[in-house]
Amino acid sequence: MNGPADGEVDYKKKYRNLKRKLKFLIYEHECFQEELRKAQRKLLKVSRDKSFLLDRLLQYENVDEDSSDSDATASSDNSETEGTPKLSDTPAPKRKRSPPMGGAPSPSSLSLPPSSGFPLQTSGAPSPYLSSLASPPYPPFPSDYLALQLPEPSPLRPKLEKRPRLPRKLKMAVGPPDCPVGGPLAFPARGSGASVGAALTPLPPPKMPPHTILSTVPQQMFSDAGSGDDALDGDDDLVIDIPE
């Protein structure tokens, strides 16, 4: 009976040992990961510093090359300016031409064989193409036109003068008078006797002529009896009321 019990105990111990080892391995793995992250950060920082230093070095090299090129051009200009008067002071020696020997043929006397493709033209008759190039089709510019010079623009633009602003005149609105039509006219009072005659009586309205009877009414309508010549002789009883 002790056999199976001992076996179970051994399995439990092995399980505990393995679990302890696994935890330790996980802890070591995390430590290594942290160290790896630190190393990567340092590497990134070093690479940035390297790129920055390379850029600065390239700028200094470009500046040195520009300065060396400018020095070389300045030295070449100085050498040219110094060498020109020396060359002008020393006259060039003249070479004496030897007379041609009678036995040696001159190059002008040698005649080239004519080519079979395109015959050469003689020097006496110029080609029409060359003559057209020699004489331009347009007339030359007149001397007066060439003598004219355009006015040079002034470097400073003329300043525009500001006109003084004139004071604006206020327009007063003219409206109808405030005094009532036909009412008493009131004036501001001044002095001790201001109340006397302060209000003036209104003017009496103008007299209108009396209404007149229309003059277009015929005279026959006003007569009580009609004349004998009228066409309406039988209408003697006709009465017309005229308002007075």
Curated annotation (Swiss-Prot):
Crosslink (Glycyl lysine isopeptide (Lys-Gly) (interchain with G-Cter in SUMO2)) position: 159, 171
Chain coiled-coil ranges: 10-54
Organism domain of life: Eukaryota
InterPro entries: INO80E, INO80E_N
Record's compositionally biased regions (Low complexity): 99-135
Annotated localization: Nucleus
Keywords carried by this UniProt record: Coiled coil, DNA damage, DNA recombination, DNA repair, Isopeptide bond, Nucleus, Transcription, Transcription regulation, Ubl conjugation
A GO CC term attached to the entry: nucleoplasm
Gene Ontology biological process terms, A to Z: chromatin remodeling; DNA recombination; DNA repair; positive regulation of DNA-templated transcription; regulation of cell cycle; regulation of chromosome organization; regulation of DNA replication; regulation of DNA strand elongation
Keyword Chloroplast: no
Glycosyltransferase as UniProt keyword: no
Broad class of where this protein is predominantly found: nucleus
Positions of region (Disordered): 59-179
Assembly information from the UniProt record: Component of the chromatin remodeling INO80 complex; specifically part of a complex module associated with the N-terminus of INO80.
Chain's role: Putative regulatory component of the chromatin remodeling INO80 complex which is involved in transcriptional regulation, DNA replication and probably DNA repair.
Protein name: INO80 complex subunit E
Organism annotation: Rattus norvegicus
